[in-house]
Amino acid sequence: MTVRHPLIAKIFSLSLIFFIGGCALLKEERTFSKSGLTITFRSLNALDDVQNIRFRYPIIVSEANIRNHLLSLFYQDIVSPRQPRSVFSRSVASKLAPLFKTALKKVKPGKYLHFTYRASRGLTEGQVFVTAKNIHWRIFKINGVIYSNDPLRIREPTWKLVRTHGQSYQRLRTGGFEKTIKNRIIANINLPFPKHKYPSRTTTKSFPRK
């Protein structure tokens, strides 16, 4: 019994440290919800591949500019490509633009925005942060469908984002090879209204959910 007690005390102490650390991390995250949009301010430590990125604070972007960015996000099915579709319809972009504008102004140094938008077709989830000349959009889920683009086809591919004028994919270099990440868009901060007239997701049949 005398041997067990110190061991139990040590295990309890370690568990308490991890619990307190986890609570502190959660306490740092602030969440706001309105009109189906939920925004969380998260630490930059949660992002990957941003070591050489210089973030911009404060983030002052006009409502019209954010609306242009939302309307310029298009996606396409990988296995059975069809005409690209809007991630956000015009009505949704107009509704969300002022919310993103307000939220971005509230981002403090060392933070970025994680967002989810819940609609009748499912959940759309992503991250957004701003650098000197660009807005970075990382989309993980569209209408409830998780992004998958495995070149080895171990997991069935789903969709990819489609670039428009003023946008580029993020590229990662690992082991001498460069990889294009097609669910991450880097867009000029002063992106104009999109010229492409792709149909919105409200008028185009969506691909089956995985």
Predicted regions and their residues:
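Compositionally biased, proline/threonine/alanine/serine-rich low-complexity intrinsically disordered stretches
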Residues: 186-210
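Mature extracellular/secreted ectodomains of secretory-pathway proteins
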Residues: 65-192
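Bacterial N-terminal signal peptides that target proteins for export
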Residues: 2-12
